[in-house]
A protein has these predicted regions:
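A generic structural motif
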Residues: 128, 378-382, 650-652, 802-804, ...
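A surface-exposed, glycine/aromatic-enriched loop/edge motif typical of exported proteins
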Residues: 251, 256-323, 414-474, 586-594, ...
């Protein structure tokens, strides 16, 4: 008996040893279609928990038996299975998941499978962000997303553009989208984010996507996800970029020839005198005399030609005397001067250098993953004295402490410095270099020169600029007198320097198998110090011997989120339920002071000037928002999808009795291509999906304390007094946006052609409008909820890959948007004027009327040139009693011209297109934005 037991044990042991002996070391690699190794791919023995991941070059090693099956997978690629058999080396090439139907996209408070998403969203990957070569992350959206418009407000390096998502949403309550960085609202400067740190940007455009963010997401949401470690191997990246900034948009065909400029002005003067009753000969003589006289006589103020003695400057034929030479030497008040024109545009702008350096390291060790980066950017503007420096550092750590516990943190630090010119915006003031150089005539000098033509200097070694105020041989400009924008840009100082910190942290706790609780916390702190110095030598502050201003601003945000998720799969049914709470606090603190009479411009501190301008001040702004929210997502068999969300929001910008608002959304989708009756299309149709959503959101973006009366504290003969500032309205509450979205997504021929078409409708009701009142009431206006607006349109996105081979790929993309905007209702108090059957009100050169788009131009309309060479404008004819006759006539007197509706700036079609070719790792790409239709008013050109 004992012998039998012993033999049986030996037999079992032999079988075990035999089975173990059958396992052997399998080596291999995992690569993509281009032959590049895939880092972090999972290699798993099917039916077991035994597995490994591929290394930095895609290689792997695993023990497996001949009858085992290996499953190789990686996100974005189709899984691959292979039986081990007798092989000792297995090389796998993974195919891209061209349908991308299982891609995960970032949505409100989490992620979702793209196929299950019922809303409207566009994702921009890191590769496209880096290719755009932008300093500001917002610029990476240009031309990439249907329905999104970007407008640059200045040429300052790093300046954030204005962004519109699906048109204007309000008359007074703002249009800016909400920015989310790693799940947390972000109100800091977008220029503090390094584009090289960004993994993806997702633009959410409809109520199903945005309603969980309540009021702050009413104008759309842009979600930024930063990079994290993707593989166990350490991955180090270093890149350096150099480029040149140059002026891309040139001027119109302005007159740049001094002789032609004089001739045209002479012609205008001559025609004026002829129309006043002079003979042609008399008009010719008077025009020659007054051509270079001061502005009171209709002259240009400057004579920059030398004309032979006894000869006329302009002949009877209206042409400059061919014997006249450019440049003029003269003596004025005992000093010799040489007067000649300068090229102001050439002096104002330059081709400048842009240089950027980035380094990052990432990897996983044990249960921890780490990503760290450092970046430096130096970007010089196209205008002198405009530039920026930015240093960024980021550290992200994620740690899986237990199977049920995960936590992590993500911190970003930025140090920045800007130099900018005084006025770089869209205005046409005398301090704006861009407007100045196009408006100033080609006859005017930039500098004051001595009799030899050398630029003169003052006692401090500063070049003498010509301010057109008589300092240059007594000559005075008729346009922009006592100003020189180029001098201001060179000698004045506008500097900002500061630090920004943005940090987020999270804790995930999984329990009872199907539940997960998440706590998120985010904090943002921006500190900016500004210095403004106006030079003591020239310009409007020369009499005060210069002026220095100091400013400091702190922007602090705190956001806390508590989220509970329940996820369950029962057969073909999948359900996710989310409940959450969010609180948001924003605090802004400012401090400023100004002094004049500087000892020296080099000392730009307040202690370096002696006269207190009594301009010191400070203020604090507080804003609080709290919300409770819920969402349910359901799908059946991966074909039918539904979602519903609800948020109850409170805002400190409203009276306590009206602070809470309720917002919701419903969405559904159907993947038709998965139906059995579509089986005949399986070979060429990858994906066909119908979707629709509806919902509402609020908007509270009107500033603080509009619901209560406010007062200012002033100095009244050395005593403190309060002065009424603004009238409050207790009854104001949320402006509401109701959204409808319907669309179709498609993909053909294994991803060769893909895209989507969407229709959207957004109605804004209870618009927050500012009501002007009579000045005798002691305040200028108050806010109320009145007025409606409508935006509707169609978006189209198309992607085409005509070539996809092992070593080469060619991609083409196109998007377009057609948008219509209309004010549908205004209160009777604002319908103060009737124009062409439309009721509304006038603000500056804009008419806001029922039935018209926002910002419809209302101004004088040019009618051409009269037979006498005079400019003409249209006017409404009236009879002898002043009653309108209904006829439109012309006039040469600008003051008598009538105002008319002249169109609006909203384009009929806008979007972007581009193409990229990748060959063996070398990439060539170009991208364009376009706009068809829409009007712009250029006051400088007019």
């Amino acid at each position: 008996m004992t012998k039998k037991i012993f033999l049986s044990l030996m037999a079992v042991l032999g079988l075990l040893l035999s089975a173990h002996a059958q396992e052997r070391e399998i080596t291999g690699s995992v690569k993509d279609h281009a032959g590049a190794g895939i880092v972090g791919a999972t290699i798993l023995v099917e039916g077991t928990t035994k597995g490994t991941t591929s290394g930095a070059d895609g290689s792997f090693s695993i023990k497996a038996a001949p009858d085992n099956v290996l499953v190789v997978s990686f996100m974005g690629y189709q899984s691959h299975t292979i039986k081990v058999g007798t092989q000792t080396r297995i090389d796998v090439v993974l195919k891209e998941n061209t349908q991308a139907i299982d891609d995960v996209i970032v949505v409100a408070f989490g992620t979702a499978k793209k196929e299950a998403f019922t809303g409207s969203a566009t994702v921009i990957k890191s590769d496209d962000i880096v290719k755009s070569q932008q300093s500001n992350v917002a610029q990476a959206l240009a031309g990439k997303v249907a329905g999104v418009q970007l407008t640059n407000t200045s040429g300052q390096p790093g300046e954030s553009p204005k962004i519109l998502i699906r048109g204007f949403s309000s008359l007074n309550a703002g249009h800016d989208p909400l920015w989310i960085v790693d799940g947390m609202p972000y109100s800091g400067d977008l220029n503090n984010l390094n584009p090289s740190d960004i993994e993806s940007m997702t633009v959410l455009k409809d109520a199903a996507s945005n309603s969980l963010y309540g009021a702050r997401g009413a104008n759309g949401v842009v979600m930024i996800t930063t990079k994290k470690a993707k593989s166990q191997e350490a991955h180090v990246t270093i890149d350096a970029k150099w480029g040149v900034n140059s002026r891309a948009v040139q001027d119109y065909a302005y007159i740049t020839n001094p002789a032609q400029f004089y001739e045209l002005h002479y012609s205008a003067l001559k025609n004026y005198y002829v129309n006043s009753g002079m003979s042609i000969g008399e008009a010719h003589l008077r025009a020659n005399t007054n051509l270079t006289a001061n502005a009171n006589d209709g002259g240009l103020g400057y004579m920059v030609y030398t004309v032979p003695s006894g000869q006329e400057f302009i002949g009877i034929n209206g042409k400059v005397n061919p014997a006249a030479t450019l440049g003029r030497r003269l003596v004025y008040e005992g000093k010799e001067y040489y007067i000649r024109p300068d090229d102001w545009t050439d002096a104002a702008f330059r081709s400048s250098l842009r240089q950027e350096y980035n380094a990052s390291i990432s990897g996983q060790t044990g249960n921890a993953s780490i990503y760290g980066s450092f970046g430096y950017l130096n970007n010089e503007g196209i205008a002198y004295n405009s530039d920026m420096d930015r240093y960024t550092a980021r550290l992200r750590v994620d740690y899986q402490a237990k199977k049920w516990l995960k936590f992590g943190a993500n911190a970003n630090y930025t140090h920045f410095r800007y130099n900018q010119i005084d006025d770089s915006g869209a205005g046409n003031s005398s301090g704006n270099v861009f407007a100045y150089t196009t408006a100033v005539g080609p006859i005017y000098p930039l500098y004051i020169r001595d009799g030899e033509g050398n630029v003169m200097y003052n006692e401090d070694g500063i070049k003498l600029y010509d301010y057109g105020n008589g300092d240059n041989a007594g000559m005075e400009r008729s346009l922009f007198p006592n100003s020189n924008a180029l001098s201001d840009s060179r000698l004045n100082k506008q500097e900002a320097e500061g630090n920004a910190f943005n940090g987020t942290g999270y804790i995930d706790v999984t329990f009872l198998k199907d539940f997960k609780f998440t706590f998120n916390a985010g904090v943002s702190l921006d500190e900016t110090r500004s210095t403004s110095v106006t030079n003591p030598w020239f310009g409007q502050f020369a009499s005060e011997k210069g002026m220095v201003s100091k400013g400091h601003q702190r922007n602090f945000d705190l956001n806390l989120q508590q989220i509970l998720n329940y996820t369950k799969q029962i057969g073909s049914h999948n359900i996710n339920v989310m409940l959450g709470h969010e609180s948001y606090q924003n605090r802004i603190y400012t401090l400023s002071a100004t002094k004049s009479n500087m000892l020296t411009q080099e000392n730009d501190e307040l202690a370096g000037a002696i006269i207190d301008k009594q301009g010191a001040g400070s203020y604090r702004v507080e804003y609080n928002n709290e919300g409770y929210f819920a969402r349910v997502m359901y799908d059946y068999a991966g074909k039918y999808f539904a979602s519903a969300s609800y948020r109850r929001d409170a805002s400190s910008r409203f009276h306590p009795d009206h602070r809470w608002g309720n917002f919701w959304s419903l969405g559904g989708a159907w993947i038709i291509s998965k139906e059995n009756f579509m089986e005949s299309t399986y070979e060429w149709l990858d994906n066909l999906k119908l979707k629709a959503s509806i919902g509402s959101q609020g908007n509270d973006n009107i500033g603080n304390f509009r619901y209560t009366n406010t007062y200012t504290i002033e100095n009244a003969n050395g005593k403190v007094s309060t002065v009424f500032n603004a009238k409050g309205s207790e009854n104001i509450t949320w402006e509401t946006n109701s959204n409808f979205n319907a669309g179709v997504e498609f993909s053909f021929l294994r991803g060769t052609v893909s895209g989507g078409v969407e229709y959207f409708l957004r109605k804004t009701t209870d618009m927050l409008l500012s009501f002007p009142v009579a000045p005798s009431l002691g305040y200028s206006s108050y806010y109320a909820n009145v007025g409606d607006m409508r935006n509707s349109g169609v978006e189209i996105e198309l992607n085409f890959t005509p070539i996809r081979r092992e070593h080469v790929q060619w991609d083409i993309n196109l998007n377009m948007t057609h948008l219509r905007n209309k004010i549908t209702m205004l209160p009777s108090e604002r319908r103060t004027k009737q124009v062409d059957g439309y009721s509304g009100y006038v603000s500056g050169s804009t008419f806001f009327g029922e039935g018209l788009p926002m910002y419809t131009f209302y101004m004088r309309k040019y009618a051409g040139v009269s037979d006498e060479g005079l400019s003409m404008w249209y006017m409404n004819e009236t009879d002898d009693k002043g009653n309108p006759t209904g006829k439109r006539v012309t006039t040469t007197e600008y003051a008598k011209a009538s105002d008319y509706l002249c169109g609006d700036p909203i384009p009929d079609l806008y979007g972007g297109f581009g193409t990229s070719v990748n060959f063996r790792g070398f990439d060539l790409s170009v991208a364009f934005t376009y706009q068809i239709g829409g009007l712009a008013y250029d006051s400088g050109y007019s």
